[in-house]
């Protein structure tokens, strides 16, 4: 292969692997920025008096808004969809590349300008202290007159464009680029997860785009969509935003569900228990996610019938989620369990995601949510689901597939240290938030009565511990990049039930397990043929 220049390879790239790597680097940069913002907030909250922002409560809310947007739109979504999805979906499909290689590249290059807009919105004038929901009238010109909210809106537009282009690419790839013999029902669960995530993005993002476009018009062109004085209604924005916002939670979680199935199956030396059940559960979660958005809005004055419906529909989501949890446990049960680093993160995910789900059942009740709404109970709940569910499955995916991406093994001791430090720190950080919420401490408040100080101090200690775990994780990555060729992993990754690719025919659809590490720049010179219905 002719040697490409650095600029040609990384700037004009059409290789799904190179684009995946750029997404991974971008996601890590955004994660560092978002973590820094969260640490500033926890430093402020470690004491009831003003600690860090010197009474500038707007700055606290700006940090909070920036933290949320960076972590969701610039870290978890790009790493899941862009890095792991781009890198491994064609390999799992037996495809040469993604369906639209140049579209793949432009969907990445929408993100750096979006990040610039996001950072500028934090730094310019008074910043966008609206929360990531940007509800009017707080986000209207009367409350935030500078350009900050507009810049945050532009950032959301650009990330939406990136995600929509990526989602179309993923859907076309899955529908049209499968290798011979690989039917939809036989696809690995990670490929199904990416397909369902792409469908959720395609259906929900246009609604967000419409909502923030109307907000931009209210701010700049004197329209009155959300202005009560002009005959508008701010609750319209809430309905539009949460119609996107709830599927967004499953967009962040769904790839983790897929990768969890791979990790649990591999490290239990068993095929996944109830594979079709897992598939239908993922589809059900995605479908139901569009029917429950108003559970975020129980206190805006919904009528009693609406509250009864949204409570019931939200509780129904617990059923397919429970099916997934018990199927993972059934796969582990009776298997030859090997506690490699990816499996530690998978077990951590199972425990923490279940905890987050249990607190979610409580907040789904319209009567109880009147007490929980806008307290730290909700903050604790969604961080258990996202900071622990999405993050632990993502870290597990890195340790599981990192050797395949780089061809370099990680240091197992550092990986285990990373897991235990992160596991302890996130529990110390987020468990006290539930107690604060039950006692009535409101969200988004930098100063509070001394009665709340004990649990807040404990939570801030957890935040400091999490910084240590991030440093250990970075050290683990650096050691892998510097010395990965010399590391030894005692735990063989390929499970016993994967068969060889004799005569280019293989009997299992987890194609990534039989490829070289790192995978070749062009993975398949000749496309593989699958001969079995092992996943049907």
UniProtKB/Swiss-Prot annotation:
User: Mind telling me which SUPFAM superfamilies this protein's record contains?
Assistant: Cytochrome c oxidase subunit I-like
What Pfam families would the database entry show?
COX1
One cellular component GO annotation, for this chain's record?
Answer: respiratory chain complex IV
Which annotated residues bind O2? 250
Q: Which GO terms describe its molecular function?
A: cytochrome-c oxidase activity; heme binding; metal ion binding
Q: Where in the cell is it found?
A: Mitochondrion inner membrane
According to the record, the segments passing through the membrane are 19-39, 69-89, 103-123, 152-172, 188-208, 240-260, 273-293, 315-335, 341-361, 388-408, 418-438, 461-481
Which EC numbers characterise this protein's activity in its record? 7.1.1.9
Name of the molecule in the record: Cytochrome c oxidase subunit 1
Q: Which UniProt keywords apply?
A: Calcium, Copper, Electron transport, Heme, Iron, Magnesium, Membrane, Metal-binding, Mitochondrion, Mitochondrion inner membrane, Respiratory chain, Translocase, Transmembrane, Transmembrane helix, Transport
**According to its UniProt entry, what is the function of this protein?**
Component of the cytochrome c oxidase, the last enzyme in the mitochondrial electron transport chain which drives oxidative phosphorylation. The respiratory chain contains 3 multisubunit complexes succinate dehydrogenase (complex II, CII), ubiquinol-cytochrome c oxidoreductase (cytochrome b-c1 complex, complex III, CIII) and cytochrome c oxidase (complex IV, CIV), that cooperate to transfer electrons derived from NADH and succinate to molecular oxygen, creating an electrochemical gradient over the inner membrane that drives transmembrane transport and the ATP synthase.
Against InterPro entries, the record matches this protein to:
Cyt_c_oxase-like_su1_dom, Cyt_c_oxase-like_su1_sf, Cyt_C_Oxase_1, Cyt_c_Oxase_su1_BS, Cyt_c_oxase_su1_dom
Positions of Mg(2+) binding: 373-374
**The protein's assembly and partners:** Component of the cytochrome c oxidase (complex IV, CIV), a multisubunit enzyme composed of a catalytic core of 3 subunits and several supernumerary subunits. The complex exists as a monomer or a dimer and forms supercomplexes (SCs) in the inner mitochondrial membrane with ubiquinol-cytochrome c oxidoreductase (cytochrome b-c1 complex, complex III, CIII).
Give the PANTHER family listed for this entry.
CYTOCHROME C OXIDASE SUBUNIT 1
User: Which annotated residues bind Ca(2+)?
Assistant: 44, 446
Species the sequence originates in: Debaryomyces hansenii (strain ATCC 36239 / CBS 767 / BCRC 21394 / JCM 1990 / NBRC 0083 / IGC 2968)
Q: Which family does it belong to?
A: Belongs to the heme-copper respiratory oxidase family.
**Binding sites annotated in the UniProt record for heme a3:** 381
């Amino acid at each position: 292969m002719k040697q490409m220049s650095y600029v040609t390879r990384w700037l004009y790239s059409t290789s799904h692997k190179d684009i995946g790597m750029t997404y991974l680097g971008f996601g890590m940069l955004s994660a560092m920025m978002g973590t820094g913002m969260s640490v500033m907030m926890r430093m402020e909250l470690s004491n009831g008096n003003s600690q860090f922002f010197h009474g500038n409560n707007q700055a606290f809310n700006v940090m909070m808004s920036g933290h949320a947007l960076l972590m969701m739109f610039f870290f978890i979504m790009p790493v899941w969809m862009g890095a792991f999805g781009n890198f491994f979906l064609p390999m799992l499909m037996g495809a040469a590349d993604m369906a639209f290689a140049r579209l793949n590249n432009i969907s990445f290059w929408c993100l750096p300008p979006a990040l610039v807009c996001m950072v500028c919105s934090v730094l310019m004038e008074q910043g966008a202290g609206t929360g990531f929901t940007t509800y009017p009238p707080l986000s209207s010109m009367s409350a935030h007159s500078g350009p900050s909210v507009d810049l945050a809106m532009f950032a959301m537009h650009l990330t939406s464009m990136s995600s929509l282009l990526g989602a179309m690419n993923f859907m076309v790839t899955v529908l049209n680029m499968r290798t011979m013999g690989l039917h939809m029902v036989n696809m690995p669960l990670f490929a199904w997860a990416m397909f369902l995530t792409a469908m959720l993005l395609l259906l929900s993002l246009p609604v967000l785009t419409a909502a923030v476009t109307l907000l931009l018009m209210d701010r700049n062109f004197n329209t009155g969509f959300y202005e009560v004085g002009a005959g508008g209604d701010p609750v319209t924005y809430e309905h539009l935003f949460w119609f996107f916002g709830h599927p967004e939670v499953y967009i962040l979680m769904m790839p983790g569900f897929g990768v969890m199935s791979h990790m649990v199956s591999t490290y239990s030396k068993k095929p996944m228990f109830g594979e079709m059940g897992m598939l239908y559960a993922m589809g059900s979660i995605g479908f139901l996610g569009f029917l429950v958005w108003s559970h975020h809005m129980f206190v805006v004055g919904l009528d009693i019938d609406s509250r009864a419906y949204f409570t019931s529909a939200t509780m129904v989501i617990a059923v397919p989620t429970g099916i997934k949890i018990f199927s993972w446990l059934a796969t582990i049960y009776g298997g030859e369990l090997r506690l490699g680093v990816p499996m530690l993160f998978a077990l951590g995910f199972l425990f923490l995601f279940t905890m987050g789900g249990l607190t979610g059942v409580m907040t789904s009740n319209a009567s109880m949510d009147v007490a929980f709404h806008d307290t730290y109970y909700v903050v604790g709940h969604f961080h258990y689901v996202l900071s622990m569910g999405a993050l632990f499955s993502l870290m597990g995916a890195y340790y599981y597939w990192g050797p395949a991406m780089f061809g370099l093994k990680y240091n197992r001791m550092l990986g285990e240290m990373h897991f235990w430090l992160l596991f302890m720190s996130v529990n110390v950080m987020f468990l006290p938030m539930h107690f604060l919420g039950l006692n009535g401490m409101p969200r988004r408040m930098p100063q509070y009565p001394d009665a709340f100080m004990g649990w807040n101090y404990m939570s801030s200690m957890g935040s400091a511990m999490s910084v240590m775990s991030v440093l250990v994780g970075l050290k683990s990555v650096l050691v892998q990049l510097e010395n990965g060729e010399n590391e030894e992993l005692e735990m063989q990754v390929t499970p016993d039930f994967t068969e060889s690719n004799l005569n280019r025919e293989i009997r299992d659809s987890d194609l990534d397990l039989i490829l070289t590490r790192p995978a070749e720049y062009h993975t398949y010179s000749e496309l593989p043929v699958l001969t079995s219905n092992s996943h049907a």
